């Protein structure tokens, strides 16, 4: 039964459905940390699932490994590929800008929510759950709780994150 509940919870978070069969806020901290990490992965490229997207994470990891390799072997030239096709540096740059913008917006929003006096885990996972379109977070916004505890200002911040997660950041930042 525990395997069933944990598999369902992971599938629910990765698919951004927001369903829960158990209060995973009662799980060990290690399991909760893994769930929060899964929140950021989101769907695959082109999906309406929230999160950073698997393809962007792959590009960021490959770009990071290329940079580390260039420090170890300064004269080496390595192209980053996806599906055996080399990626243009503009795509890598755009992905890096997207990730930096995502993390900046995330950090500023967690700080803005901190004015409510809620604990850090509640604020962090509330922003993570909304920008990644997951549904519930942890602590006071866990699967057995709701977002009604936040002030009107904080709710507007979280609404912006729901839109940013569904529509992606680019269209909202252009507006």
Question: Can you say where each PLM-predicted feature lies in the sequence?
Answer:
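Membrane-proximal intracellular helices of multi-pass ion channels
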Residues: 1-175
């Amino acid at each position: 039964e525990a395997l069933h509940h944990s598999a369902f919870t992971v599938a629910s978070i990765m698919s951004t459905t927001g369903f829960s069969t158990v209060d995973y806020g009662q799980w060990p901290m290690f399991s909760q940390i893994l769930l929060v990490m899964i929140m950021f992965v989101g769907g695959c490229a082109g999906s309406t699932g929230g999160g950073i997207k698997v393809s962007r994470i792959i590009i960021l990891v490959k770009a990071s490994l290329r940079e580390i390799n260039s420090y170890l072997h300064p004269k080496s030239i390595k192209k980053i590929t996806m599906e055996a096709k080399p990626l243009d540096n503009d795509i890598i740059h755009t992905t890096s800008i997207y990730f930096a913008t995502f993390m900046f917006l995330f950090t500023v929003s967690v700080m803005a929510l901190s004015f409510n006096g809620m604990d850090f885990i509640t604020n962090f996972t509330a922003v993570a759950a909304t920008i990644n379109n997951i549904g519930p977070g942890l602590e006071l916004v866990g699967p057995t709780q709701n977002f009604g505890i936040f002030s009107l200002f904080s709710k507007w911040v979280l609404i912006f994150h729901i839109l940013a997660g569904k529509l992606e950041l680019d269209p909202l930042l252009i507006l």
